């Protein structure tokens, strides 16, 4: 069964095959073409189709729509962009300049009748009507970062951000446009999936606005016999992404949980995003050369190490890098040993030696050289990334922040008073201290004002900008007036208990001990088998019950149709039903598949928690799937900046 990302890839490959229904052509049969995209189209393509794959699909040149371009005759030009006025004006300019002989226009969102008429008039005026071969609405206006993780915007994502949704001076028409943008992308998502969902969401929230607009859009399309996009042939639709049962779309508002986006994480992918600003599966790490030029590292689905370890705790990743390096060195030494034992020195000698049956082992080893070289490239890349993360961990004491925040969120007693930690000049950066304080403020039930005042004074002495606290205070007061919401968002931590350990890490091919860093290994509510060595403690991870973040707890309740005061009050919208309504049916079967979407921005912490949760729920008889998405993807620094912007709109300077 195809995943969301695979279905989007297939849709774009079909577009690049000039919207032909035939199977994907080989490079030898591909029609050579030019790909012209706007920035949104570029953001959609870049995480899922590499430049090498574009070449194999016959794309000889890929350029920005608004860049300076020369005329290229006799080659199809495939446009992939939003039907905005700015983009359409540029396409009309291309018509007038006669840049191409063959035009294939593919719009990310449906183009309105008036705009298509204006485009046709421009083509008629330019005398190129016959040159326009196809005009398509593609319904792929979302960004697939993983098989089960998507966002709606990358560049200019502030248009759909938490700040944009919650700022005080947003006009009604601006909010309508923002919600329509989210709805259009979610509609495109379900067209790509080939399924019509049941919609659940909390009432009186931005999520409800999205839910009602989306239900209306789905219902209108379903009951339009001519334009129905969900009546595809089963063989074409691939039976839809999910099982025969309809999926549930759980729309949630970022306001339900402000602590998790600020949490110092310990899993590899979330750490890369938090510390190194991972974006569209690409991260830039400063090279160790004399120039120290940032080097791009592509973390895609073809990277076996990344696919295996992106959700692992960082110390586990470090040990895995060391093991991969040792495996590579053993393979390299084996080839050298075989060559030496047979008296082979150069590549030319290998060709002569292949006639001998005794060289079968050497032949196999030599044939594996390309795979070994790729393995070495990935080892070097992940060593570079891990070293950059390690430097941040040491400088900012991120391991200690992770452990302290886990204890706060799971209501455990801290080893040291928070005030002492905030006053420690060596304890992280001002931003880290502010994140820790906000998590403490959110998770604590009742806090004396004198204690808060002392904590705020410590933050100010550390150089923290306290603007965000005014907004967090207002947010918490609203949450406290909504008992059902407050109950649903009780924190239990990100699913970990921790045990200190020392471990080896690698840097440029050599291992070293993380001096001064207290490494943490995930402990799943069971005893960890410890074996004392001469200089470190080794720990074995044992999977067991996983504590869940608020989004995961709510997802579990909705999928299993558990009776709960808070989720029972959620809207229940079924676009396929002839009579619309929002009343919860009496008889409901548990959902096997869910799309969880966070209005106001998602993060890798919640994504990984959902991934871990669904792994725990899999059995031989039950196969459940969850797709997680957000209007944007923000790390803690970006989210803190949004909170500060909202706090700046409030007169009260600090939280109390």
Curated annotation (Swiss-Prot):
Query: Where do the sequence repeat units fall?
Result: 85-121, 203-245, 419-456, 460-496
Keyword tags: Cytoplasm, Membrane, Repeat
Q: Where does the protein end up? A: Cytoplasm; Membrane
Family membership: Belongs to the STXBP/unc-18/SEC1 family.
* Residues annotated as signal peptide: none
Membrane topology field: Peripheral membrane protein
Q: Which InterPro entries does the UniProt entry name for this protein?
A: Sec-1-like_dom1, Sec-1-like_dom3a, Sec1-like, Sec1-like_dom2, Sec1-like_sf
- List the record's Gene Ontology CC terms alphabetically: cytoplasm; membrane
Gene3D superfamilies linked to this entry: 1.25.40.60, 3.40.50.1910, 3.40.50.2060, Syntaxin Binding Protein 1, Chain A, domain 2
**Pfam families, per this entry?**
Sec1
- Tell me the name of the encoding gene: Slh
Q: Which PANTHER family match?
A: VESICLE PROTEIN SORTING-ASSOCIATED (PTHR11679)
Renumbered to this chain, region (4 X approximate repeats) spans: 85-496
GO terms under biological process: vesicle-mediated transport; wing disc dorsal/ventral pattern formation
Which purpose does this protein serve, as stated in its record?
Non-vital for development.
**What is the protein's name according to its record?**
Protein sly1 homolog
Record the organism.
Drosophila virilis (Fruit fly)
